[in-house]
Amino acid sequence: MAFTNYSSLNRAQLTFEYLHTNSTTHEFLFGALAELVDNARDADATRIDIYAERREDLRGGFMLCFLDDGAGMDPSDAASVIQFGKSAKRTPESTQIGQYGNGLKSGSMRIGKDFILFTKKEDTMTCLFLSRTFHEEEGIDEVIVPLPTWNARTREPITDNVEKFAIETELVYKYSPFHTEEQVMNQFMKIPGNSGTLVIIFNLKLMDNGEPELDIISNPKDIQMAETSPEGTKPERRSFRAYAAVLYIDPRMRIFIHGHKVQTKRLSCCLYKPRMYKYTSSRFKTRAEQEVKKAEHVARIAEEKAREAESKARTLEVRMGGDLTRDSRVMLRQVQNTAITLRREADVKKRIKDAKQRALKEPKELNFVFGVNIEHRDLDGMFIYNCSRLIKMYEKVGPQLEGGMACGGVVGVVDVPYLVLEPTHNKQDFADAKEYRHLLRAMGEHLAQYWKDIAIAQRGIIKFWDEFGYLSANWNQPPSSELRFKRRRAMEIPTTIQCDLCLKWRTLPFQLSSVETDYPDTWVCSMNPDPEQDRCEASEQKQKVPLGTLKKDPKTQEEKQKQLTEKIRQQQEKLEALQKTTPIRSQADLKKLPLEVTTRPIEEPVRRPQRPRSPPLPAVIKNAPSRPPSIQTPRPSTQLRKTSVISLPKPPTTAARGETSTSRLLQPTEAPRKPANPPIKTVPRPTPPVHTPPLSLIPSSKSLREVPAQKAIKTPVVKKPEPPVKQSVATSGRKRSLAVSDEEEAEEEAEKRRERCKRGKLAVKEEKKEANELSDSAGEDHPAELRKAQKDKGLHVEVRVNREWYTGRVTAVEVGKNAVRWKVKFDYVPTDTTPRDRWVEKGSEDVRLMKPPSPEHQSPDTQQEGGEEEEAMVARQAVALPEPSTSDGLPIEPDTTATSPSHETIDLLVQILRNCLRYFLPPSFPISKKELSVMNSEELISFPLKEYFKQYEVGLQNLCHSYQSRADSRAKASEESLRTSEKKLRETEEKLQKLRTNIVALLQKVQEDIDINTDDELDAYIEDLITKGD
């Protein structure tokens, strides 16, 4: 269908109310001002002036102006400014700050109601006027932006429509502060040179007391936040001069506020004992994955276009046949050239896609720089930049979160590129919160290492700060202003200043006379006392920062025990929370629920299965209290251990409660049998409080304590043919130890809990709409149907959204009374307006299955992820078999009809596993081969395979590194030997040539008529003389 046919269709409209809505993204007012400074920096400006002009007739009493000498804009560039979201800077390799095409509009509208922009480029002068006042007074709902243009030399209008130009200038004269053409031209004349931009914001926003939010009166050299107390507020939160000084990690643009230069800083040059740490991680993949998906999408479209053009060229060539007329050849040549061009473009797009796919697997490297702020020790924390622009400041990490003196006064600096972390629209945070927390955690670890490396704590923290003049016990008090302390601080941190002409940074040598010297705003290289750096032509010297290394200390047994105790406490809190749940049997019970409670607890473990945890470490098992020998019974060698499930029985009768006063016991069976009816989950009547072990601490005996919870807990239990014993004896020493999970698994667990909490709040609203579909029983859904529906997880499907089909994967399944719903997470979403996931009904017209890709077309990460999901599903199905339902906790006879593998097969598999583990056992593994040889199947189930694989890979890598280093040393030795031999060869050839020259000279003295021109002639002549002599 031709594009012209779309002219009658509806289009998205941008109302002028969106101007205000868009501006609310800037909670931090200085962030809005920084957006306009960023635009000047991206335009390669060397200077920007920020100043206020008094205009009492305007709201706020003054206009705020931003004048730079950057590249400026021509009319087409200025027209793209008013297109929200359009940016020419959005490339993965871009080092420019602007990426979203929104900063000028959102920043200016946050400061005031109206702004007018004057820009010059080459021979054009363009004015852009965006006014909410104009829209309000004219009653216009859509956004209208006048954009008149003049010739820079003749000042004549540049337009094809004189009437349109007249309307645009009339609006500018009526609603802007400049009411005549002369006043408008005067603004253009303020722009120095042939290019630059002037942005004027007026009708500023006011506070509740009628005063503007920006204070330009208290300090004539600064722009401050109105009504902000200096006490307890960081300088950058109160003073725009202080904020602009650290806004860029490597400032290359001069910033003037009210005509006074901002002394910009390179933070790494302002710290005591700076040290750099290189950090490499493969966790930062979100932005890179987005770029890969975009590149794949673009490459696929380019490939389709190229194939279509090639097909068209072949068809035309066949159809023309023997037609050799000139017009036919020209037409054929044009089609073929188009096909060749499109094929080249497709090849380029494919190479870009392949490069991005390779880059996705490469670990990202960041440089952490830490140092001590001895000038203001209370101003400490992490400064995190993105593409050299400050995003977060004073972020506390690691030991600083504890609030003590450890790591106090330390400042960290890191510059994160776009491909690692992407900032939010207001550039005050990062879009991916999970990866940002991972970055902070890594900086915390390196901060602790830096604190050890500089050894301040070993010398004494108080003594260290006393040396630099911090004599007060109050941490926030400034240092002493005595001259000796000022000199002491100045000796440790050399002065680094920027030249006003070449914009290069120069480090000045220390001089006692310059301790209290204030350098002028127009400092230049010729004022440098260093003779090697006293001219602008001299190259800039890089700061020499020592390189540090992160050394991870192994955890002590005490730390492991402490983490284990904390894990047990958390599990007990979960158990207590589960005991407080109430069943839902009718709509009356549903109405009694608080709003944040979901009414689908039964589907919860099926819809969101927990990721299997790591098994406990054998070292922890050995340190656990052993079972008393008096109650141990010999274990038959042929006894087969099986896993069973704790299921919840019906409420006990009075007689049964008398028999089990503190808890009800279940006797596990040899083989699991399916109950006749699915168990209805209820809460038992109140019983006296009892100390209950956590869910994962299940005694490995025949008597098991039932957990009175709303959810059916599925936990593998090891059975032994021991006679029943008293509860107090059975629980005395048989608690299984928990393995301490690593930090990343704990973080993922916390993420899942928060996500479930959010989904729980939404589930209540959905349940109220579907309340009429609830039955009187909470357990109507059959578990078999639920398990069958869960097999749909991981399916690759296509979903239709807004008449477009998008590929994705089923991540969750919800079984209703009448239908099954899939939650599909999309692989690639082209715009921010399309959701990243969506609930669809299975079998509807908006969803269809997609043929799964073959293994060779999947990336290693995809194959690994799919393998993990498949293993997790198999494990869940193996554990999810229900146990025979028992009444009132009475023991039942084991089912001997169930099929089971032979004991010899089990023992053979255990022996094979032991042999494999012994064969590949790492050298420094805590479990020896001797201990491994006597492990039984229960201990092998708890074997720490994750740590085993990790140490094996480390050992293998060390072995490879040793071979590599040995090969490298041999190669270096061979290269050195080769260079020596080549040197000797050259020396010998030079001696031979010199000898031949002397022989020729000697022969010419003896016989003047000898004519020898080449070395071969000389050799032949000498050989002939020797032959004649003989």
UniProtKB/Swiss-Prot annotation:
A GO biological process of this protein is: DNA damage response
Q: Which residues carry this modification: Phosphothreonine?
A: 582, 731, 834
Bias kind Basic and acidic residues: ranges: 532-543, 550-577, 763-772, 779-791, 837-849
Using the UniProt annotation, give all residue ranges assigned to the region (Disordered).
530-791, 837-874, 882-901
After translation, how is this protein modified? Phosphorylated by PAK1 at Ser-737 upon DNA damage. Phosphorylation is required for ATPase activity and recruitment to damaged chromatin.
Q: Which UniProt keywords apply?
A: Acetylation, ATP-binding, Chromosome, Coiled coil, Cytoplasm, Hydrolase, Isopeptide bond, Magnesium, Metal-binding, Nucleotide-binding, Nucleus, Phosphoprotein, Ubl conjugation, Zinc, Zinc-finger
Top class in the EC scheme: hydrolase
Q: What's the name of the protein?
A: ATPase MORC2A
Organism name: Mus musculus
Gene symbol of the encoding locus: Morc2a
